[in-house]
Amino acid sequence: MFEMYVDCDGKKLRCGYTTGSCAAAAAKAATRMLYYGGKLEKITIDIPKGIEITVPIGNIEVGEDYVKCSVTKFSGDDPDITNGIEIYATARKIESGYSLKGGKGVGVVMGEGLYVKKGEPAINPVPRQMIQKEVMEIVPKDKGIEITISVPKGEEIAKKTFNPRLNIEGGISILGTTGIVTPMSEDALKESIALEIKQKYASGVTRPVLVFGNMGEERAKALGFNKNDMIIVSNYIGYALDICRQKEIKSIALVGHIGKMCKIASGCFQTHSRVCDVRMETIALELALMNAPFHIVNEVYNMKTTEGAVKFLEDKYSEVYLRIAQKIKSRIYTYTYDTIDAEIVMFSMEKGVIARVN
């Protein structure tokens, strides 16, 4: 079994392998059994990370003109929705050359702006290269091979992934740039954000609606924003703005809870609490600038949550939220080198929308 570990906050976490590695391994094993017979229990492949990995082979099916087998997706300690699913490859002999197809459970790209052309199976460029390299090393020079990748549970699993948001229908994507799944990978999440921004821009969305998570998305929908314009950016608002600026997007809407929004008002564009937590300081500062009594400022400063502050302040100091929203708008404009104008919508769980700046 493949074993590779990374250190994350002092914890030893096990890596896994990508759906791309699974597809390449299954394709290589099926091709070898098709041309040279026998039944393999495991197969070794090269991955872009620069190492070899050996993975178990299962569900072997030998037909008159094909061999089909699978690799079980292993995600290590990463909380990956695809962990444990079977990635199948079917190898068939053809007269010459190489052909790659997507079967049941592999998504089909239905929009522009992704790594794969519209109408093609959602098998990303690096996995495509991996599959071709591994199988063509085995196929005799005067022969050819057709590979079909399929994922029986792919359509069901895809509903819980980014694919519906990316206009990929019918299944999951075969992904991976290194061949390895790194637990809690920040890079993987940021890549998903960038991909969604680019895809939506290519499909005609020129004013994206950025939200931090599902709660913000639900609020934005209730306010009448178009769901197709929404992009979940998690803690990476700064990174998302960088991608928007690269695409020369001039206007966005940002809908978020006061807790996250206060951090941006103070210039924090990575909003994870471990990186930045100035929520109460932000509200307290604005209250002080409004000449609120010291005991009010001090009480808010020492509170644990922004929801508690909203409840405590009631409506008497509601101007504070407008001031914070205006600062967020200004911060975004400055952060993007005076290129992106933002509509700001800030809400609390208790009161709903507490500030809106166009």
From Swiss-Prot:
SUPFAM superfamilies assigned: CbiD-like (SSF111342)
InterPro entries per record: CbiD, CbiD_sf
GO molecular function, one term: cobalt-precorrin-5B C1-methyltransferase activity
Reaction(s) catalysed (UniProt annotation): Co-precorrin-5B + S-adenosyl-L-methionine = Co-precorrin-6A + S-adenosyl-L-homocysteine
GO biological process: anaerobic cobalamin biosynthetic process; methylation
UniProt keyword terms in alphabetical order: Cobalamin biosynthesis, Methyltransferase, S-adenosyl-L-methionine, Transferase
Keyword S-adenosyl-L-methionine among UniProt keywords: yes
The EC number(s) this enzyme carries: 2.1.1.195
Name used for this protein in its record: Cobalt-precorrin-5B C(1)-methyltransferase
